[in-house]
Amino acid sequence: MRLGAPAAAVAALVALVVAAPAGAVVLRPCPDSPTARCGTIVVPAVRSDPSAGTMRIAFRRYPALGGRALRTVLAIEGGPGYPSTGSAGYYLALLGPARRTTALVVVDQRGTGSSQLIDCAPLQDFPYAPFAPVALRPYRRAVARCGALLGSRSDAYGTGAAVDDMVAVMDALGVPRFDVYGDSYGSFAAQALVLRHPGHVRSLVLDGTYPLDFDPWARDALAVLRSALRATCDRSPTCPWRTADPGERAATLARRLRARPLEVESRDPGGRPVHVRLDDRGLAGVLAEADGELAIYRDLPAAAEAYDDGDPAPLARLAAEAFAGGANGPAQYYSAGLDAAVECHDYPQLFSLSASPVGRLAQLAAGLRALPADAFAPFDRSTWFGADLESYDWCIGWPRATHAPDPPRPAGAAYPSIPTLVLDGDLDQRTSLIGARRVAARFPDSTLVPVANQGHVTALVDWYGCAAGIVRRFFATRRATGTACAARNPALHLVAAFPRTSRTAPEATPASGDESFAAQRRQAWCAAQAVADAIARYPVIPDSSGAGLRGGRFTATGAYLDHGPVTLRLKGVRFCADVAVSGRVVWQRTSGRVRAVIAYGASRVSLAWSLATLAPAVLRGGARRAGSPAVALRLTVPAP
């Protein structure tokens, strides 16, 4: 396709400033990987201003295991702020069997990882205090201080400069054309790369993507939250909100928490005691994490019902899990300063960055007042804005740019006709399917694949293998094939109830040969839920160890990224307070099959079901009674 004059001029300029001779970089073995080779290049800090100095850009190359690479994939991590080298294990797992003929390159974006680092203490060391009142906004002030510390380089960390760096690395490696995979913010950067360097890109995969000109109010996120609450309920026969409006039930819960916040002792994912204070803004924060922690969708309806019945434990646990992140840690693993520098340079703002801080704040306030009352349903405006979940006001005090504008998409740059695959989970709030459709429509040769029952980013932790397989085939053929599995991705099994004890629990269903009585059937239901609950916690537990809802511990073994089986060992795990479950559980992640041998009270049973279907769990075994023959247990439990 012939570029128009403005775009051609931009493309020529970009080619001049990023070109590097092949073989112009020295590669050395990486200290923590026997096969990877590490290197660095030096690039201009500001390509339009030679006096601005230089920056160091670090990268890794993983060769094709079969020797000769038929293709090279450049993988770009999300954030902003996370280094791509830190997620290399995820990208290698994604390539899987394709690694034999595929090389992988990961480049740490300027500002993070082993590249020229932004380690901005006001942000990096910011005390973790979510949901501060709007009037205080201490994080906004920390962002302003960080911008001031960066000085004349505060506008030197934009996405455009970062992807120019990546192309410079590929040129130095002698790879003139390559495939690109970007996840989350990495897909934003990948769009910028292909718009600035279309001739370098062989094919493009955008996973969990959003438009460069997204809505800065993030209203798409709330629309998806409402639809996801409805969809997860409709798809799970055990959802207690199936006959209600889930969005309205969430709104009712928010109003109740606003009137009387929940304060209770709970436990974090590792089982450590934590004090939870949950108000309406806190609930907004919990639900904002649901596309990354699907247990929130799984548990919320039943947890809300339990809270209404006077039991705060399930809801408090969701809050403890959602807010367990804590402080930022070292900047090389996540640079909060880079996050702010990118957002204040590239992201659409709710005010003009040419205005003064006072003027920016006035424009933001006016925009908020102009929104309809239900703009952030199921939350009202003050709840959602006050939850401080989006970067609405981060850039109020960010310095004005001192160099020529360098937006991610150069003026006049057209979306190229390059084979493009766009993946998005239908439960993804932060990079919604609404935005993904807009992105796909802009690329002339694109295929959009919605992935059912999946949250944020579909292919990196894809235990069923559907999205990952689509990506691998796409890189091999540059065509989206075998996509039907995306619509069949298994639904979540929502919790039916959180009874405090087995006395108020639902009963398991007797099958042929069962000799149980009602109390044993209720205990069996509790035992099955204890096993399912431990599996649901697996993605969030630290150090492979977690706690039961009402007591007990469990451990998990099995590499997170290899998609092999996970073995869980339960010791006194209590979903219901009076049913302590111990035993061994094997969960086959690729098939969803669960097999358990457990004991609780006088019962010894086996338990089997699949997370990939809605078929009930089958429980077989016996219960001993003092002085009496064993009672045969032959029961089923709705898919836990």
Please identify what each model-predicted range represents.
Residues 2-24:
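Secretory targeting and sorting signals
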Residues 1-8, 296-297, 429:
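Generic alpha-helix initiation/capping and coil-helix boundary signal
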Residues 235-348:
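Alpha/beta-hydrolase-fold enzymes
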Residues 25-282, 347, 351-640:
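Gly/Pro-rich cap/lid or specificity-loop segments adjacent to the active site
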Residues 10, 23-24, 28-41, 103, ...:
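Solvent-exposed, charged interface segments at domain starts and junctions
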